[in-house]
Regions:
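SAM-dependent transferase fold signal centered on methyltransferase-like domains
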Residues: 1-275
Length: 275
């Protein structure tokens, strides 16, 4: 879509160099531009603002997602220099600040998949819950209680607002803090289901996920895996989990969530544990 939108201002060669996808979150569009085209970034931004009628702000992502809060550097190219927006998904409304919190619209199908897994009456711990999108969608679809933990105070503040917007006070509980510390102090053996939505640190936090999960409960273990063949990625993730887990585990399923680089994939392994 991005290449088609910009075909009037870029040559065929330039268009071929362009990263084809962009993220639209509410009224905000975030694009990545290769070094060879940064001299034209303002033109690209202005053209997108003109062509995409629902957009009010075009930002250039000038860094990868990084740091303790998993944020990215953004540069305004066109429109309003405003990073907070409203995002809608699965009948829910969310306030998101794209500069100060981590959020990806590309995980919508995974959010629905997790919500469909949840049973009425369950308690779920979302260890890296951000602004609460996974948690709120699950609580909206099923009668469950979700503890949404995040170390980023901006995310925790927005999560509390999103809980109120979606009228889920008491169903989703926003907790600010390090997931391991929160679980140790408050949530040991509390969850029927635990989400580990920080794939780059899942191995580090697996013991905490197990601590929070009741015997017979389910852990959704996300990771980044290298695979020469895409078809091998999910199976390699299963093997890795089984090598590192300290508890008896039954694999319920696994899948690729999305590619994240050449021969690298974000995967999820769904496991039932016994303690």
């Amino acid at each position: 879509m991005l290449k088609k939108t910009l075909e009037s201002v870029l040559s065929t060669k330039e268009s071929d160099e362009l990263i084809s996808a962009f993220d639209q979150i509410g009224h905000i569009i975030i694009i990545r531009i290769p070094d060879s085209l940064t001299s034209k970034k303002k033109l690209i931004g202005e053209t997108l603002l003109d062509q995409v009628k629902s957009a009010k702000s075009i930002f250039y992502q000038s860094s990868s997602v990084d740091g303790e809060f998993r944020t990215r550097d953004l540069e305004i190219l066109a429109g309003e220099d405003k990073t907070e927006t409203e995002y809608k998904e699965s009948g829910c409304r969310f306030l998101v600040d794209v500069r100060n919190v981590f959020f990806s619209p590309r995980l919508s199908s995974e959010r629905t998949r997790i919500a469909e897994f949840v049973n009425d009456g369950e308690v779920m711990v979302n260890m890296f819950g951000g602004v609460g999108i996974f948690s709120i969608i699950a609580a909206k679809m099923k009668k469950c209680t979700v503890f949404n933990i995040d170390i980023n105070p901006f995310a925790t503040k927005l999560c509390k607002k999103n809980i109120a917007i979606n009228r889920l006070a008491g169903n989703v509980i926003s907790i600010h803090g390090d997931a391991s510390q929160v679980i140790n102090s408050q949530l040991e053996n509390k969850s029927d289901r635990t989400l580990m939505l920080l794939p780059e640190k899942s191995d580090e936090f697996l013991d905490s996920a197990i601590l929070s999960t009741k015997s017979g409960g389910v852990i959704h273990y996300y990771s980044h895996i290298h695979a020469d063949k895409k078809s091998d990625a999910a199976k390699l993730s299963e093997q890795h989990y089984m090598q590192i887990t300290p508890v008896k585990s039954t694999i319920l399923g696994s899948k690729i969530v999305r590619p994240v680089g050449p021969r690298f994939y974000q995967t999820v392994v769904d496991v039932k544990i016994k303690k």
